[in-house]
Amino acid sequence: MDLQDILLHDETIFKDVRVFNSDYLPEEFKLRQSQMEEMAFSLRPALHGGKPSNNILLGPPATGKTTAVKKLFEMAQLDCEDDIICVYVNCQLHSTKFGIFSQIYKKIFGHNPPETGVPFARIYNKIMNELYDTDKALIVALDDINHLFHGNIISQIFYDILRAHESYEGVRTGIFAVLSDVEFRFILDKNVGSIFNAAEINFKPYTYEETYNILKERVNLGFYPNVISNDLLEEITTYTFENGDLRLGIDLLRISGNNAEVRASRRIEYGDVEKAFKVSKSVSLRYILNSLSDKEKTLLRFITRMDKKNITSGQLYEEYNRENKIGYATYNRQINKLEFLRLIDTTYTGSGKKGNSRYINLRFDSKQIQENLPQQKRRSL
């Protein structure tokens, strides 16, 4: 069946539109093989009666952290279901202690706990007794863990998971913390940080070649043959690589395909991609901005208001500190976070103390950031 017959039959250029979904899990995930091997070694002690090792999965958004941990958990549950229980929790959706332990409860018992009328202690007790009775280890992946920083709820959750053995002898638990915050350990209470003792597994941004190969694979799986040219795919790859967010490229493919279908076209043309650029970039930027803390948003908003090129970190600190009293160490951590998320670029000037002064420049247009930053809530009088 040629492309024309396929279109006449299905009225679509998509072979499988699901491969462009944000929650799609590829059958193979070779690009993060080394990171998955590190995580697998952390699970091995649990298969022999020991305690799983804790990990921090650290990297900018859209670098494969979520996919890697989900694929590993999928494999572990198939091969080692008698020894280990793997629970993935999206903390953006479940950001309370009850919500997170409800997900653990659901994984173990196959249904949610009652939402009312049952104290948390009873749910917690049932989970831990089940682990004790079955002699299975529990490993919990907490994704987008920055959503637990408010009110330091993260320390409560870590404490309840990692110190379970103190009340339930022999219970074995571990945590995979998935995040992009370089200063994660500053959040934890000391008594929790001392028992977390996690190894860092780093997910660096994809190279241009890796980005192209991932997008090419999605094209092959998601579109019928010859729907998009290599030239357009390379243009999307370049745009994706420069913006440092793989989700942007996957969205561009999906939106470009939709644009072509609106025109009743069998192929994606340049105009379809150009139109998709305007939609997709704002969506990706908004996702990154929503991951910032309120104080990081305040600093970024201040930088956009200044809208100066090549301002030094020292000059920026002096001006920012006049309006927002902040210690230099805290300010420096926030700047590093903004750079880590590729919202700003920094380059060393060669001057300043020990030559460590940096120029700071926005990677995005000031107006675009301001339009996508969530509005600050006004304090009620």
Residue spans for each PLM region:
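Post-Walker A helix-loop "phosphate-sensing" segment adjacent to the P-loop in P-loop NTPases
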Residues: 74-84, 110-112
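Terminal-proximal interaction/regulatory segments of ATP-powered molecular machines
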Residues: 307-381
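Mid-core helix/loop region of P-loop NTP-binding domains shared across ATPases and GTPases
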Residues: 7-16, 21, 93-214, 224-240, ...
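Conserved C-terminal helix/linker of AAA+ ATPases
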Residues: 259-284
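Walker A/P-loop nucleotide-binding motif
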Residues: 49-74, 93
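Conserved catalytic segments around the Walker B and adjacent sensor/switch elements
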Residues: 54-56, 79-93
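AAA+ ATPase "lid" subdomain C-terminal helix
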Residues: 241-246, 254-268, 304-308, 324, ...
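A short, basic N-terminal segment
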Residues: 1-53, 379-381
